Amino acid sequence: MDKNFYKNSLNIFNSNFSMKANLSEKDKFYADFWEKNQIYQQILRKRRGNPRFILHDGPPYANGDIHIGHALNKILKDIIVRYKTMAGFYSPFVPGWDTHGLPIENKIINQIGSKSTLEIRRKSNDFANSQILAQMKQFKKLNLLTDFKQIYQTNTPNYEAKQLKLFKKMVSRGLVYRALKPVYWSPSSQSALAEAEIEYLEYRSPSLFTSFDIKKGNNFVAENDKLIIWTTTPWTLIANSGVAVGENFDYVRIKNGENFYVLAANLLEKLAVIFDWKHYEIIDNFPGKSILGIKYLHPIFEKICPIVSGNHVSLDVGSGLVHLAPLFGEDDYWIGRENNLEMVMHVNDDGKFNENAGQFSGQFYADSNKLITEFLEKKSKILHLSFIDHSFPHDWRTLKPVIYRGTPQWFVSIEKIKKDLEKAIEEIEFPENWLKKRLTKMVVERKDWLISRQRSWGIPLIIFYDQNKEPVLDKPEIFDYIISLVEKFGSRIWYEKTTDELLPEKYQNLGWTKENDILDVWFDSGVSFFAANISDEKPPFDIYFEGSDQYRGWFNSSLINSVIYFGFSPYKKLLSHGFVVDAKGNKMSKSRGNGVDPLVILSKYGCDIFRLWVANSEYYNDIVYSEAIFEQNVEIYRKIRNTVRFLITNLADFKPKKYELTEVDLYIFNKIQKLKNEIIQNYDQNRFVRVVKIINNFIIEFSNFYLSIVKDILYADKEESLKRRQVQYNLYELLQVLNIAIAPIMPTTAEEIYSFIQKNNKQISVHMEEFFKKSHFDEELDAKWDEFFQIKDSVYQLIEQKIKSKEIKRPNEVGVLLKTDSDFIKSIDLEKLLMVAKVEFSNEKTEILQLNWEKCPRCWNHFEKINKVCARCFEVLNEIVPEKNS
């Protein structure tokens, strides 16, 4: 008989499930399929009566194309939502967008110039809405399980009105107050900033040691003695109105040359080196409290200022004497208030000096450092000047340096709700305890929250001032009236109407004015738990999941707002992920030149491989993107796909039915149950990288052992043989498990696989299926097979030696004489399991037998020749062409 006869007699089937994925085409095909059949809506209807699981989407900013960080975040969330949905939960996912803020406002101002506030707001609103549509189109390419017709955005009248209801609640609880205090001020944005809007970048500052002359001494210091002062902000010396000492620190009066200096005793040796003092003399030693009240001459202007006590004085750096400019530092401010120091503001909103700066008027603050240093040099007041590179606060939007600057601002008191916040944090589940500490530090250690901004595009602070310029905070009916207008017309009404038109009739024509500031944009997004309609679900929601920078942002503002409004956290569990970095560990962004467009990646690899990269990343750290890492995930995908293709192809003639299994089939079936349990456990823990690794490792082990031994059965046994059906039963079980297991991560591939699976009660989509449940795993059965694998390893060491010495070409040529006393080992089909021609048992030693048997032309196994083919193939062929095989 010719070779084709033998080949055609084998159980070899073809499959339309191709090795090549063509994911880009299939992404579009299945996205259309899901939308046409309203799969998401069907899932929600099917699950509506089930337990709830809500992952609340933190709103990205509606400006520009989505970046790789956006894609990472949305995919991570989608994996959770898909898993929870398949696990039986009602889990609607409502995407949101944050729409107000400086980037959009600046973009509009650059386009149209300095127009009216109304025009800026109208254009900004239109632009934000257009950006939502653009980003929505891009997010759709990520195959998210959601309905983009059901979204929330922070610029709708209903959302804005709810936000102002929460603000009213803050006012009614006495948490909102106005004060002149130093706050982060961005000259580039010309607005106050909260801590959450600060980014620390490297910056070069002068390190200046100068001296202030004492005007009148006492028993410890004398007139014209020089106080040594250290500063990195010479521009603030204009606003100096005091010097702080540590009351209980030791200070010295020393003589160097013709001059007498005062400084902290502990810093003398260090400063003597810096100043190159080689022959100084200590004249006196005294505690800081001994010179409290001593007056000195201002370093620039002809005025006299006092020495006061300061708890913030440190002996780590400087001289132990701290220059105070009360409107340019928080500690300075409180010390200034306690000691009635002069509050000098010499910097305008744009960072330029006003008339209070005298001869330096009109200078930009940063440029004045050089001029002020030169001025002091001429007066022989500089002891040392150098420059330091250090981490310095910058505006997170413009990336320009910010300053502390005292301006009248609106605040929410955190001090008053500190205990409530601490209690709420105790109820939150964190994956790691240090994350709990991080949130606590970010929220609870704040004294207050700066909520006012001096911009146009945002939600107005709906506060009125009476005829005496005092804010009116005790009239709830006024707030209710404004909120009703905003709910009807949107927040633009505040700018379209006059003050009297915005007030209830009884408060009109009293000479009142309205506030011009807007609310912090973190206030906007931070009310989404209340203002957004999440399918009519109410907080607390199950999970908030954003980038790690949101501990100071959305996590922070949401927690504060919810505790104020509801008395509890808006989230039960908090998850965060790192930033996407390049192969060198640098954060990826367009500005750095190392940014990568997620849409380009999707076009090249397809959505499922992009999603696999996300799932296969340890997201709790920074996530590395590189071509090499993506190619690794391509290989993992290929391995999964090829395994699935093998399963589908070899199940072509299988009708789902339960079979009694042989020992090895039972062992593999048991392993599949363990696989299921581990997948469930890691999905429950949101450890997707472990899910991918568990699946990948299982496939490798499954292919190396089980598929190696059963291919012979699948291809060469009778089509209806019990052994073959037993193997197919395991293949079918694994195919179903893999199909469900990868569905949350690779929805397109899972849907394609599902179309090839035969089963009863089949759904229209795999994503409407239920996730498999935990199964019994027999540890005793699993452990029993350890003995076999030890024997297999020892046998194959001997076989490899034979192959290496070229005595044989492959294992199935040999026999094995096996030494064992194990009843279990003797009971299993060792010839199949070891893939050798013959196994016999020995009481002496294990050895390899060279048989010189014939190779079966049909199955290629080696056999002791009786017929043209081996006994098994003889039996199979005899049913096809009787008596022609002998």
From Swiss-Prot:
Belongs to the class-I aminoacyl-tRNA synthetase family. IleS type 1 subfamily. The gene is ileS. SUPFAM superfamilies: Anticodon-binding domain of a subclass of class I aminoacyl-tRNA synthetases, Nucleotidylyl transferase, ValRS/IleRS/LeuRS editing domain. One of its GO terms (cellular component) is cytosol. Catalyzes the attachment of isoleucine to tRNA(Ile). As IleRS can inadvertently accommodate and process structurally similar amino acids such as valine, to avoid such errors it has two additional distinct tRNA(Ile)-dependent editing activities. One activity is designated as 'pretransfer' editing and involves the hydrolysis of activated Val-AMP. The other activity is designated 'posttransfer' editing and involves deacylation of mischarged Val-tRNA(Ile). ATP binds at residue 590. It catalyses: tRNA(Ile) + L-isoleucine + ATP = L-isoleucyl-tRNA(Ile) + AMP + diphosphate. Monomer. InterPro entries: aa-tRNA-synth_I_CS, aa-tRNA-synth_Ia, Anticodon_Ile_BEm, Ile-tRNA-ligase, Ile-tRNA-ligase_type1, Ile-tRNA_ligase, M/V/L/I-tRNA-synth_anticd-bd, Rossmann-like_a/b/a_fold. PANTHER family: ISOLEUCINE--TRNA LIGASE, MITOCHONDRIAL (PTHR42765:SF1), SOLEUCYL-TRNA SYNTHETASE (PTHR42765). It is found in: Cytoplasm. Its cofactor is Zn(2+). Its EC number is 6.1.1.5. Keywords: Aminoacyl-tRNA synthetase, ATP-binding, Cytoplasm, Ligase, Metal-binding, Nucleotide-binding, Protein biosynthesis, Zinc. IleRS has two distinct active sites: one for aminoacylation and one for editing. The misactivated valine is translocated from the active site to the editing site, which sterically excludes the correctly activated isoleucine. The single editing site contains two valyl binding pockets, one specific for each substrate (Val-AMP or Val-tRNA(Ile)). HAMAP family: Ile_tRNA_synth_type1. Zn(2+) binds at residues 856, 859, 870, 873. Binds 1 zinc ion per subunit. It comes from Mesomycoplasma hyopneumoniae (strain 232). Its main location: cytoplasm. L-isoleucyl-5'-AMP binds at residue 546. A motif ('HIGH' region) lies at residues 60-70. It comes from the Bacteria. This is Isoleucine--tRNA ligase. It holds the Pfam family tRNA-synt_1.
